[in-house]
Amino acid sequence: MLVHAAERPPASDRRRPHAILRAIVIPYFELPSLHLGPFTLQAFGLFAALGVYAAARIAAREASRRGLDPRPLSDFALWGVASGVVFGHLVHLFLYHPEELSDWRRALSFWEGLSSFGGLLGGVVAAVVFFRRRTIRFANYADALALGVAPGWGIARVGCFVIHDHPGVRTSFPLAVEFPASAARTLGFSGARHDLGLYDALALFSFAVVLLVLDRRGLLRGRLLAILALMYGTSRFLFDFLRASDVPYADARYLGLTPAQYFCFGLWAYGAWQLKKKEEA
């Protein structure tokens, strides 16, 4: 059926819903650095430190609730952070931005360029070494670790959000960040875009609530870390399809997937294996 021009809504009316959505996106902002004498603390570093502290404190508290000695988790925190930074930087260099390997100074600058999954890999390696050397059964502490890691990682991801480190594709979604036109000169892109740091943080905080509810109701005991692996692996795999490829510092892709998406297969395998092992026990 033909629609006459007189029956069509005015162009301004047709554009109004889109304009409303654009009006409610998150405005671009930057948090200033914190200067402490000769030291400068960047916003990301502050949230990363808070995340590590929160994860360690919550995990230790949960271990105590279970009648376990919390000191191994407090001692492990330093191991986990050190190994996480090293592996996080190496994964960033070798998988995300291998072009930077041509400059040996970048390879040694461990504080510049970190992959969250590389950090996770470093934490896993540190956990294997630490718990074996201490002859402590890791499974006893797995639930406590899950309850600490989820909110702690979420806080660290807020650090990614406040520096807008992971821009996504353009969108009019209400949780998008509106990068101003002036950002094109400094960042190389502008417009309303998904911000994957925010999405990751919201997902992890949600997972923390789910795990806490399961724990307090006595459900899936001994399986919370596996549940976290399955939930985060799924959310991260889906979120990474929203990552921008039209920005100057875009993540590398391999057969259409980011390195993190391949790591998600490892999380799924670990989660499924742990759940199956618990069922057979």
What would you call each of these model-derived segments?
Residues 20-281:
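A feature for loop-to-transmembrane-helix boundaries and adjacent hydrophobic helices
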Residues 8-10:
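Short linear/disordered segments characteristic of secreted peptide precursors
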